[in-house]
Amino acid sequence: MGALADLVKVLFEPTAVFTRVGEEPRFLAPFSGLAVVQVAIALAMMPYTRPVMEAAMAQAAQARGLAGPPPNAGMFLYIAIVAQPVILLLLLLLSTAVVWVMTSLFGGEGKFGTLLSVVTYSTITFIIQLAVTLLVLAVRGAENIQSPADLQPALGLDLLAPETKGFVGGVLKGVNPFAIAGYWLTGVGVSVTHRLPRGTGYAIAAASFVVMLLVGVSLAMLRPGAR
């Protein structure tokens, strides 16, 4: 239970949590906690995501001239929800690989298992972002959510330029308080677990943030209609 409790404690006592991580890296317990909460939030979002997906699938079927009812959007949503822990795992591994490379460049030898634990605990801010997104959608009401863009309320620099789309818009959306807090935690974690100066830890986290942001936005641009 201590490893799960540290998912909350890391927000208030990051140095103490990452000291324990440095002594004994932990992944399965915090990952399981993140995955369970992520799936619960995704299920709670279904009243907002399902109508949008149904409309998009019906529009796609009409554009292709397909007769009959559109595919079952609910089935696709449940499949996507079940797959979320797998996607989360892949993202954690990718992010850890980037942090490991940056740690090796800036601070010497990086310990992948320890860094995976650091990144996993730092990802709690992403889960908080999902919860805030759900809250915003609930306040707006399902009747006011009609497109995929409505499912991604502005929470970052995109608040300053709401009309900006495409690659730049994706970058602005990615620079938000939750992402910054997550990489701040990563910087603290790298510094504590690898006994590096705090400034070096922050530099590693900042470089990793830039790389992951550019990769994420570039992949998002590959989706149909992203431009």
For each predicted feature, which ranges?
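Selected alpha-helical membrane-embedding segments in polytopic membrane proteins
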Residues: 16-128
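A generic alpha-helix surface/boundary motif
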Residues: 12, 96-100, 183-185
